[in-house]
């Protein structure tokens, strides 16, 4: 966790809680370092540190680690050890659940008694195939004359003979800690301990939750303070909070946070899964709830965690079932009846906070609602670091870059991304892995590492879970695929890419970026293609909305669809919302009588309010495309909604040349094809028409190629002895001029001159209505102002003059 100084005016309590996150400085807090001598019972400290803590060489000390784990060791002085560090080997570290660089605390532990009896068992996977008496071979030499302190529940590794065996201390008598002296009895009867049971104890702690620093501070302040130090609230004279409601999109880590809190506080954790309480017998569901709360009160301090709380506490007026209503009432009375200092805290988690009964959301029941949202870039980096800490990563993996590219991903999506990258790594090694073999070569296992390439492949295959149903393959269209339209490209980059890639520039100049763009122009000029390219070039998420799909037959559902789409876009910001055929849902209001009770009007109103309500914080862009700009409602075209109106004209000669080149980029074209001549000849053709010409020429080439193949086959079958040279050898391997000539016979223009005049008239009226005052200049006294004024007036002048041509941007 980063160590940010809180601003002085923030609440002291908040300050205190982030101080929970940052460790207090204290002489007995030491940083874990790798041991030099590999002894399981010894830790070494610098002599000065030992002096400060009043320890002597050979003292038994108690060390506290993470997840409420502790163990006992013998302290030795070591000059080479740095002062604030403590050296311990891997065994001690795993007992304390810490890694190198973590902080542990050291305490004096003077009254460690000699043990009468200890019960020690081996761990099953380390004793496979070990024959003979374990006690004589391993334990006796390990404990002989060593006076080792042990702690119940610890694991330790003993090296002996050919291999190492891991043991677990099952029971110690008389206390949890004791020293194994020569007269201590050691029992090692019983079945070996299963490794799985051990691993399961290694549950999640605060270190395993990333990207929710602020929320974590709030939760710890609401949960740990009342459970650990109830006297704080008593002395101030307020009641501690009783309930916390966590809400947020699925996969953002609500249940994980609750688990981590339970493990780290050491409180009794009672988990209620919403649907499990239900029972078919009358009154049984309520009694299940009551039992859970009674159990928690008995074992106080405790945390009751209700997962998916919306399933057992829905709004009472909306539910038909009697049982649900009774359960909600029971939950309300139970939460009120929790004695204020019973040290029971109720946590609820849901991803639909608005479907919960409002009576539950008042103060005194769920006092605090905490939004566990989609993490930002720093949060995503934290989550990625947590998920990759046990992965074997190659040198070139750049987690920061990956966290930049994963907009809108929640924790679960990032976990899936890491898994997918690892799978990708395994797939590459599949040729050397034999599934039938019992074991895999250690060499192969060691050579595996997840590289940056694997992460990139995984990024291509995964998408944020918020966008699963409106999933859009981000199209593989780049700027190179689009011929011409240079001005439009630049305008688009400024509108969409700058706010995503340089947000700090907008802050510096104190303006929020513009939100919307409308492309209009004749069909087949690349409006949709441009939207695809911008989605691909700038690493934003892309949701494509087909206008007509929003309308449904149910009353009120069409508007709900619009709301839902905007919610999704906000969740996975930065996001480009692309409305294709905008005219189908944004026709002028008032003239749509008779269609589904004015559904189109209501959808438009919803659209307008959504566009105004888009928070400036979230970078969501709207791109509309239409070829009927004249029928779009004028309220939608005002600045602040779709403020950039971009006319995408028929391509001029240069653009046509570029389009031909872009279309034929991947095709083998003969030398005798003069693309410039084609571009000259296709005056008035749209981009789609030009693509069609290329496709047709390509088709003719393929047809000829296949005919040649058939001819060769026929000859071969008639005359098997014929030499290869006699075959028809002029193989058609490229598109020749003849193919284009043939193709041009069928070429046609899809946009008539009358249509173009309509678009130009519309563009001109816009230009005139907006070009008012285009000759504006500042007073000539200000020398600097004058030049900028001229520059500002320029674009209008040129575009108005060029309006007669078929290309407004010539």
Curated annotation (Swiss-Prot):
The record's annotation in Pfam families points to: AAA, AAA_lid_3, CDC48_2, CDC48_N
rRNA processing is among the record's keywords: no
In the record, the note on similarity to other proteins reads: Belongs to the AAA ATPase family.
Biological role = Probably functions in cell division and growth processes. Interacts with certain SNAREs as part of specialized membrane fusion events where vesicles from the same organelle fuse (homotypic fusion).
Q: What is this protein called?
A: Cell division control protein 48 homolog E
Work out whether the entry's keyword set contains Acetylation. yes
Chain positions with Phosphoserine modification: 41
Q: Which residues form the signal peptide?
A: none
Q: What is its main location?
A: nucleus
**Where does it localize?**
Nucleus; Cytoplasm, Cytoskeleton, Phragmoplast
A single GO cellular-component term from the record reads: Golgi apparatus
Which InterPro entries does the annotation name?
Answer: AAA+_ATPase (IPR003593), AAA_ATPase_CDC48 (IPR005938), AAA_ATPase_domain (IPR050168), AAA_lid_3 (IPR041569), Asp_de-COase-like_dom_sf (IPR009010), ATPase_AAA_core (IPR003959), ATPase_AAA_CS (IPR003960), Cdc48_dom2 (IPR004201)
Give any single GO term for biological process: cell division
| Annotated ATP binding sites | 248-255, 521-528
**NCBIfam families attached here?**
CDC48
**Keyword annotations:** Acetylation, ATP-binding, Cell cycle, Cell division, Cytoplasm, Cytoskeleton, Nucleotide-binding, Nucleus, Phosphoprotein, Protein transport, Repeat, Transport
- MF annotations from Gene Ontology: ATP binding; ATP hydrolysis activity
In the record, which positions carry N-acetylserine?
2
Q: Which gene encodes it?
A: CDC48E
